[in-house]
Amino acid sequence: MSETENRQPKNIKNNPKIMKAWAVYDWANSVYSLVITSTIFPIYYSILTTAYEKKEYVAETKTWIDVPVRHMIRIFGEEYQPDAVYGYSLTISFFVVVLLSPFLSSLADTIGNKKSFLQFFCYLGATSCMGLAMFTGMHNVFLGLLFSITASVGFWGSLVFYNSFLPDIATPDRQDALSARGYVYGYIGSVVLVVICLVLIQVFAKGAAQQLLFTRISFLLTGAWWFGFSQYTFKHLPQFGDVKDKLPKDLVLLNYKNIFKRHEEQGGFFEVFKDNLSFYKDIAKESFHELFKVGGELFKDKNLKFFLSSFFFYSVGMQTIFLMATLFGKSEINLAQDKLIGTLLVIQIEAIIEPLFSQDYPRELVIKMLFQLPSSFGLWLVFGLIS
């Protein structure tokens, strides 16, 4: 019996402890979605990139309103609005995840260490959230954007491997309920931390300077929350598979403890990497070949093709709203901070209800609705909104 088999529980599927550990990761990482993506960080970014507010008279209402005047961010000699640069930075993070996911997923399947990749992206995201506390103004705005990018890569990259565990730990009849459980954990956990952060910022902070300080502390709390609660997941989630014989004996990604020893023997890290370059090339070639093969198979089914197409437009639209709504509300509409966060909290709390009931729907009915409604209604809705 292999070492891997020894360290794995005998009953992996539908094991209550393992399923709970999987769901707890949603509790851990969902704070990024609410604190960093949707509420506190976008408002903080908008405040730090606003030069001043000027008074403008509105003749219709015969009132004076405060209009923010934004700093401009210079990139390669051109000036850009801070909100646009923020959107571009998130786009970069998604491109990184899209490019890395097929290769890393294939590599993880080959060497059987999905949990290690999940840990890597989790720690990347958590430390990046804490790194955002170093963003204090326009003088280091690129540092803030860099940590925003790496936090996004960590979050979305970890979800690739997190979601791939679902069919490994639960049978099909339990997967919907477990997925819903994860969503509920995530929604509740993120609301709890946001409330804690808001109490710090709005109640304990005295004056604008302290509010900014406690906001940065909120970023530290977000990273610590993500890192800390994920340890329960990593403790109980099994590492599937074992290292296969076809792998290079001293593969850097596996035998990282021997890197320094080989560094002395062979004259450098890059020499070690070059020894295994053919392995990485084979993995990359196989991963993208499999990606296009699966894509071709999916689009052979008419219903599935329409569903994926409509879901793509739906997902793009919703993600754009989630990522940019707060900045738009703060910078363009000049909504008050408490109204912005209050609205998002109401939406988050309302979202807890749906997963609690959706797991009880007949599975066949849900699948039928997913395949028929988006394909017929989703595209028309998208086209209607565009027009």
Regions found by a protein language model. Give the residues of each.
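Short amphipathic helix-loop junctions that connect adjacent transmembrane helices
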Residues: I36-A84, T320-G342
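Transmembrane alpha-helical segments of major facilitator superfamily
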Residues: Y86-V97, G342-A351
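C-terminal ends and interior cores of transmembrane alpha-helices
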Residues: V98, Q119-H139, S376-S387
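Helix-to-loop junctions at the C-terminal end of transmembrane segments
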Residues: L99-N113, I353-K368
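C-terminal membrane-cytosol helix-exit motif in multi-pass small-molecule transporters
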Residues: L193-A205, G223-V243
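A single, central transmembrane helix in multi-pass transporters
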Residues: K274, E290, V294-I353
